[in-house]
């Protein structure tokens, strides 16, 4: 349970930063709309630096095996997500916004700083596997679901800066190209901002949402329960049933980096997509806010179960 306690401590630290972001808006120092500037820095500078730096590792058979393993697990998890969604959609009458919020997590922004703190910088590369799979599905399945059509956003997928950074990092890794020390130091320094900046943005976003409406609307709790507890519980039981942690050397730690991505709150990008496709963005925003706040309790709980079973 040590990892679970460390995770709780790390999430508590991130939550305090979230409160700072909330406070600067509520005190009138900034407007919630001012977060757009930080969002640009976060998406176009910080995240790519983290990804590029993650791939600056020695190419060994163990790492290659770990990458293939994490990618396979990530694909398998998303297949389960989609199957569960097909089941929940009809049984629970989930609308498109709720479905997409249940399937897609805020993995990129939240998991990477947690993995850095809990397991070390060398494990960040494995969390990229989940991000790759999610990005592909986000701009294909999720966009089609929100549009109510089969039209796919290939251009947005292929021009996504994080996917480009992953492709560039993977290419450098495969070609055994090590960047000069000043560059890797710069990437590391900028990348270290991912946790604080991500939570400041979350806090600023939460500040513009009426929390009374978020907490007092019963319907909000259904997709949040599925995202934080229902789906992660099914996933961890399946991983336990097939003993996935024993498939490769260091399997439990690598598996944890991928599982952490599956238990994070709803994806912030979904709310932006809901606005783009004229869906109920306020409902999506409420799910994001509620799931982000409740994940402080549920993530350590699910990791505790992961440690117990695997």
Q: Where does each model-flagged region fall?
A:
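Alpha-helical transmembrane segments of multi-pass small-molecule/ion transporters
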Residues: 1-310
């Amino acid at each position: 349970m040590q990892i679970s306690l460390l995770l709780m401590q790390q999430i508590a630290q991130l939550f305090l930063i979230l409160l700072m972001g909330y406070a600067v808006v509520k005190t009138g120092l900034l407007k919630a709309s001012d977060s757009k500037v930080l969002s640009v820095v976060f998406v176009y500078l910080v995240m790519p630096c983290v990804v590029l730096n993650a791939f600056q590792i020695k190419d060994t058979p163990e790492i290659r095996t770990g990458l293939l393993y994490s990618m396979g697990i990530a694909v398998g998890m998303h297949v389960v997500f989609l199957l569960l969604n097909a089941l929940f959609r009809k049984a629970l009458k989930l609308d498109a916004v709720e479905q997409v919020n249940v399937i897609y997590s805020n993995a990129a922004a939240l998991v990477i700083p947690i993995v850095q703190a809990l397991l070390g910088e060398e494990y960040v590369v494995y969390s990229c596997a989940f991000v790759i799979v999610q990005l592909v599905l986000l701009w294909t399945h999720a966009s089609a679901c929100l549009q109510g059509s089969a039209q796919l956003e290939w251009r947005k997928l292929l021009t996504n800066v994080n996917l480009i950074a992953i492709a560039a990092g993977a290419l450098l890794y495969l070609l055994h190209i090590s960047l000069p020390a000043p560059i890797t130091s710069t990437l590391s320094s900028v990348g270290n901002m991912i946790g604080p900046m991500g939570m400041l943005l979350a806090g600023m976003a939460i500040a513009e949402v009426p929390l009374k409406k978020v907490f007092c609307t019963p319907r909000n709790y259904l997709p949040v329960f599925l995202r934080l507890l229902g789906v992660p519980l099914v996933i961890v039981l399946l991983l336990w049933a097939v003993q996935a942690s024993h498939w490769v050397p260091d399997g439990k730690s690598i598996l944890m980096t991928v599982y952490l991505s599956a238990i994070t709150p709803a994806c912030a990008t979904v709310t932006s997509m809901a606005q783009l496709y004229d869906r109920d963005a306020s409902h999506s925003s409420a799910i994001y806010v509620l799931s982000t706040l409740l994940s402080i309790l549920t993530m350590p709980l699910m990791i505790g179960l992961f440690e117990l079973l695997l």
